[in-house]
Amino acid sequence: MAMVGRSLLLLLLLVTLAAGHGVVVVVAFDPNPLQDFCVADPTSKVRVNGLPCKDPAAVTADDFFFSGVGEPAAGGGRGATASRRYGFTARSVDIPGLNTLGASAARVDVAPGGVFPPHYHPRASETAVVLAGAVYFGFVTSYPDSRVVAKVLRRGDVFAVPQGLVHFLHNNGSEPAALYASLSSQNPGLVLVADALLAAPLPVDLVAKTLLTDEATVDKIRANFIVHRS
């Protein structure tokens, strides 16, 4: 017990000294790289936190290059995900050289009237730039304020979303819209708020009490979602 006490005291002393000398301690989800780069080797069967590194001698400029951000994600291709329900298509920017660099990116296309519904990235902040069209874009602050911070963005506008906060976009115009989103994690994660509550196999009475409604209403809304079975 005495040893634990001395260790804790030493830790507190080090933190105090660091603060006194203006040292900033940063805690991140993605670890710092230990080499100049670690180009992902998708053929490797090794499983690590990230992807194994390609032989540096075999690395080329193409490993740090992606062509296609200027093309609609609706064109499909590798890394494309479409949602008819919400009217958007997202395509990840596939750059093997981003492996271990704590970053990822995607192009998102939203049809007129479409939305990217309220969602959050548990492991990343986001910066989005509008490539075409106009969207209502913003985020919601944490409880208890639940303040909406949002505005209409047009081509060339940039908006930042803090890590872990619920955010959304709505193309309420008559033209298609497109955005380029960069995230501060190689694996930012994506949680759709409505799907997490209504598509997950949660007890119906729990969902009803959460939404301050009755079970019949929950069942009616759930019929519009794909209910995942555990």
Swiss-Prot record:
GO terms for molecular function: manganese ion binding. Its main location: secreted. It is found in: Secreted, Extracellular space, Apoplast. The keyword RNA-binding does not apply. Residues 1-20 form the signal peptide. GO terms for cellular component: apoplast. Residues 86-219 form the Cupin type-1 domain. Disulfide bonds join C38-C53. Pfam families: Cupin_1. Glycans are attached at N172. Keywords: Apoplast, Disulfide bond, Glycoprotein, Manganese, Metal-binding, Secreted, Signal. InterPro entries: Cupin_1 (IPR006045), Germin (IPR001929), RmlC-like_jellyroll (IPR014710), RmlC_Cupin_sf (IPR011051). Mn(2+) binds at H119, H121, E126, H167. Oligomer (believed to be a pentamer but probably hexamer). Belongs to the germin family. May play a role in plant defense. Probably has no oxalate oxidase activity even if the active site is conserved. This is Germin-like protein 5-1. It comes from Oryza sativa subsp. japonica.
